[in-house]
UniProtKB/Swiss-Prot annotation:
Residues with N6-succinyllysine modification: K21
Keywords per UniProt: Acetylation, Phosphoprotein, Ribonucleoprotein, Ribosomal protein
Residues annotated with Phosphoserine modification: S17, S19, S79, S86, S102, S105
N-acetylmethionine carried by residues: M1
Biological-process GO terms, alphabetical: cytoplasmic translational elongation
Keyword Chloroplast annotated: no
Gene3D superfamilies cross-referenced by the UniProt entry: 1.10.10.1410
Gene Ontology CC: cytosolic large ribosomal subunit
Annotated region described as Disordered, given as residue ranges: 76-115
Any single Pfam family the record assigns to this protein: Ribosomal_60s
Entry similarity comment: Belongs to the eukaryotic ribosomal protein P1/P2 family.
Record protein name field: Large ribosomal subunit protein P2
Function: Plays an important role in the elongation step of protein synthesis.
Amino acid sequence: MRYVASYLLAALGGNTSPSAKDIKKILDSVGIEADDDRLDKVISELNGKNIEDVIAQGIGKLASVPAGGAVAVSAAPGSAAPAAGSAPAAAEERKEEKKEESEESDDDMGFGLFD
């Protein structure tokens, strides 16, 4: 990431085709050592490309990635999922009832003033 950021800094600073020397100079200014293999890889991937286009492509790819930890699961129509789903639903209702009871007992913070 540091190499990409340095490349972008150089490109946004007016250098349309930053070299390894340019990127190393940026990294050295903040005390970061450069790995030549990774640096060469970044330069070869980005060299000759329009930075705005690369950023736009990246934003498009990030938009397609699910975020927030939500799991997207879909059952195929006509599958056995609804029949199998009734047992976990009943267990889930029992868990909810137990959870509600425990929440009520926690309202008084365990002191039981009116018990």
